Amino acid sequence: MKVIYDQVADILTIILTEAPVAESDEDKPGVILDYDDKGNLVSLEILDASRRVNIPSKIEYQVSPIGG
């Protein structure tokens, strides 16, 4: 998984897999979901991220323990 914040474009992108994007869908205004040719989620983009996410340039990543 990769998280990218483009400060110039103000877009937060979360890439779940490196599969090629076959289709994109704007789920809600400013939230774009990208899918591969099998319908699996590849990535999501949040447009105007600084208005939607507190401090988009500061990302915290946490893995929950198995079974917890």
Label each residue range with its predicted role.
Residues M1-G68:
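Small, basic N-terminal interaction modules of short regulatory proteins
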